[in-house]
A protein has these predicted regions:
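Long, intrinsically disordered, charge-dense linkers/tails
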Residues: 1-277
Length: 277
């Protein structure tokens, strides 16, 4: 076993879990990596960890669901992602089209290099922000009150190496058809034109740019934005019709105990429908 504290760049990281039952999936992922995990389920544990870290600046506590398993403790050797940056750009609006909506929760999409045998989507919550909000609930006032009023922030981490995610990309490209290559080619050309303009004018200060140059800059920027908006709108439309995208997001929500009410009912009905196929 690697022990409770794992050292990376002279920093000791202690992995912990606050609820071994609710966070069982994350706990098992950490154990599969050979890590031991502390159980910190006391009401004052957040305060204790903050106090301990203030006394030991090279040691920190990280909850097992605060990031994807391969980033909880950074290593010199990192996994490579199958998806290129261009492919991530295509998939981002697809997944955004199926993002859960909640006034009290803010979600953001991130593509991560994870093992292909891990889940296609994992939902994580930043350690610092979560801890501040939890402390706000027990203390109140000052900065704690400020953090307490902020919405909960979660990251929908898409496994860029998972076969299901690759299949979704292939389905999206097939649904978009030849028009996808056409609009992407136009975007690349517009971006290249914008880069050439920036290269020519990079030595000039804003005040030295002529009215014509400022107008051209705005036109080039507007062209790139318009083309990307056109492509993203179509990708969102395709994504909104892809049940598999919603299914793997809901699986991640279910793992975190965040799938309830009508959304849970819809997930069950969709699961039955997919099984019947």
């Amino acid at each position: 076993s690697r022990g409770l504290g794992d050292v990376y760049k002279r920093q000791v990281v202690y992995l912990y879990v606050d609820d071994p039952v609710a966070k069982h999936t994350f706990l098992e992922s950490a154990k599969a990596k050979g890590y031991d995990v502390l159980v910190m389920d006391g009401q004052l544990d957040n305060h204790y960890m903050g106090w301990y870290e203030s006394k030991h600046e090279k040691e920190r506590f990280v909850r097992v669901d605060s990031d994807v398993i391969d980033k909880l403790i950074q290593k010199e050797e990192q996994l490579k992602m199958s998806l290129t940056e261009a492919q991530q750009e295509l998939l981002r609006p697809v997944f955004e089209s199926q993002m859960p909506t909640d006034e009290k929760i803010h979600y953001q999409i991130a593509f991560e290099a994870m093992s292909p045998d891990q889940a296609p989507v994992v939902i994580t919550q930043n350690e610092f922000m979560r801890r501040m909000k939890e402390m706000a609930r027990t203390s109140g006032g000052g900065m704690s009150q400020f953090y307490g009023q902020m919405p909960d922030n979660f990251t929908i981490a898409v496994n860029g190496n998972h076969p299901v995610v690759i299949d979704i990309l292939n389905d999206v490209e097939k649904s978009y058809g030849d028009k996808l290559k056409s609009v992407t080619k136009k975007i690349d050309a517009a971006v290249a034109e914008q880069a050439r303009f920036d290269e020519v004018t990079k030595e000039k200060k804003e005040a030295d740019l002529s009215d014509e140059e400022k107008k051209m800059r705005e036109e080039l920027s507007g062209k790139v934005i318009a083309l990307r908006d056109e492509r993203n709108a179509r990708l969102r439309e395709i994504g909104s019709q892809n049940r598999l995208v919603r299914q793997i997001i809901d699986l991640a929500l279910l793992t975190n105990g965040m799938l309830k009410g009508k959304h849970l009912t819809d997930f069950i009905q969709r699961s039955i429908s997919l099984i019947e196929k």
